[in-house]
């Protein structure tokens, strides 16, 4: 997947989650798939672009939800699972297929 296509996918998910990221960056990250700043800047690992659809979707939705919910509480996890299931992405534990 190209960087442009990935950023388009992030924006499609952003509409679904009803948030607007201020910036989307792709770069090499050694320890995690992504991060979200308090200012609305999303940064994704370049390696994520090579992962299966479900893994990418989970990382994208996870970071977008952090724009509304800064923690991993019940609401956060419920919404994460609902958004993924609504798009037909199977949710199993920490990974999505």
Predicted segments with their positions:
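Active-site-proximal or metal-binding-adjacent scaffold patches in catalytic folds
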Residues: 1-58, 67-97
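Walker B catalytic acidic pair
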Residues: 63
